[in-house]
Amino acid sequence: MVTCEAGIASVQQAIKDIADGNFVIVIDRESRENEGDLILAGEKVSAEKMAFLLSHTTGIVCASVTREQARVLDLPAMVQENQCAFKTAFTVSVDASSGITTGVSAADRTRTVQLLSDPTSISQSFVRPGHVFPLVSQPGGVVKRPGHTEASMDLMRLAGMYPCGIFAELVNADHSMMRQQQILDFAEQHGFTVITVDDLITYRWTFDSLVEHVSSARIPTKYGEFFIHVYKSIIDGTEHFALVKGDIREQESVPVRVHSECLTGDVLGSCRCDCGAQLDMAMRYIAEQGLGVIVYLRGQEGRGIGFGHKIQAYALQDLGYDTVEANLQLSFPIDAREYGVAAQILKDLRLTSVRLITHNPKKFFELQRLGIHILDRIVLPVIVSSENERYLRTKKDRMGHWLNFPVLNESEDEYETVERTSCC
């Protein structure tokens, strides 16, 4: 098993390699393209390195650029309607307007990349179309969009390079796509550092400051007085908050609940899920302890698919799909939530260690991976109703949640860790 520390060390080596003018390999997520790209700083390119890139990849040489670079260099989108599954932001392709022949040779493409990496280049420095494919990186990098374009741009920034990286997809001798073991063998043969997009995401959540504190105030609730601290994501502008009970600074073993926004459950009292009940019980528990934190993550409706799509999933569930099948039917991941914002908020609150209130193993292990020191897990009762029993069982059986309740035909008095409700 590759540890978080090993992943961070690999990213640190990759950053050094980029600064030194060496290739690195970035492997994509299995749920996306599931391939590896050779990446090099545009300003470090040479005809020899370009020839190596062309010899071991598809030969489609991409160059990451910022939105501002695309504007200044007059690089419009390749098409008006982007139908690519991953919304890869191709601009028109380019060649250097001088100093080349046909534009396709290693030397010619090197010249084009050198101009893309030159801050003095202007629109007239290029002709269109050409043999190098600029891709516009999303602001926020891999935290915003976990693609090779953003990975390339993040590596350039972290290495102190001009914001233009070149990359192409690795292929085997028969031009089939390299997969993980083939990529690792190739990297070992040539001495290249390999990282994953997720390694880079973890690195950025660990070392970059990606949330900012906005405001704080006292807030009286039915469970007593809390303090609310509002944070804003600098990636997408979403505002999240932490409800804090007691003086938690530098405290050990602080009860913490990381709660994803669920308007239907938290506000409307929907019985399709147990979200509202979990939030209510967490507030009550923390109030009784006199110490604790609830981090409330907004923008995570429907396990990260959005409010409108969650309601679509509800309609599919009424047709017989379970909560996992409904997401997949809508072409969404089973669980698209990420917890980097929560980790940064908890670090800003200066907790030393926490006891996490959760049944969700993904949340538990991801927060650990992001540097949160979790001592143990607090188990609160599961609220079961006729409306949410199948939902809860699906979370247990298909998503691996740590829920402990008996089969449907057992009598109610046999439930030990479950509370039943007549709701709905």
Curated annotation (Swiss-Prot):
User: SUPFAM superfamilies from the xrefs?
Assistant: RibA-like, YrdC/RibB
Q: Which UniProt keywords apply?
A: GTP-binding, Hydrolase, Lyase, Magnesium, Manganese, Metal-binding, Multifunctional enzyme, Nucleotide-binding, Riboflavin biosynthesis, Zinc
Which cysteine residues pair off into disulfide bonds? Answer: none
**What is the originating organism of this protein?**
Chlamydia muridarum (strain MoPn / Nigg)
Cytoplasm is among the record's keywords: no
What cellular-component terms does GO give this entry? cytosol
- What's noted on cofactor binding? Binds 2 divalent metal cations per subunit. Magnesium or manganese.
> Which residues are noted in the entry as Mg(2+) 2-binding?
33, 148
Question: What GO annotations for molecular function exist for this entry?
Answer: 3,4-dihydroxy-2-butanone-4-phosphate synthase activity; GTP binding; GTP cyclohydrolase II activity; magnesium ion binding; manganese ion binding; zinc ion binding
Annotated region (GTP cyclohydrolase II), positions in chain: 207-424
Q: Could you tell me what this protein does?
A: Catalyzes the conversion of D-ribulose 5-phosphate to formate and 3,4-dihydroxy-2-butanone 4-phosphate.
- Protein name (database record): Riboflavin biosynthesis protein RibBA
> Could you tell me the EC number(s) of this protein?
4.1.99.12, 3.5.4.25
Q: Which PANTHER family match?
A: 3,4-DIHYDROXY-2-BUTANONE 4-PHOSPHATE SYNTHASE, GTP CYCLOHYDROLASE II-RELATED
HAMAP family tied to this protein: RibA, RibBA
Task: State which pathway it belongs to.
Answer: Cofactor biosynthesis; riboflavin biosynthesis; 2-hydroxy-3-oxobutyl phosphate from D-ribulose 5-phosphate: step 1/1; Cofactor biosynthesis; riboflavin biosynthesis; 5-amino-6-(D-ribitylamino)uracil from GTP: step 1/4
Q: Where is the active site?
A: 335 (proton acceptor), 337 (nucleophile)
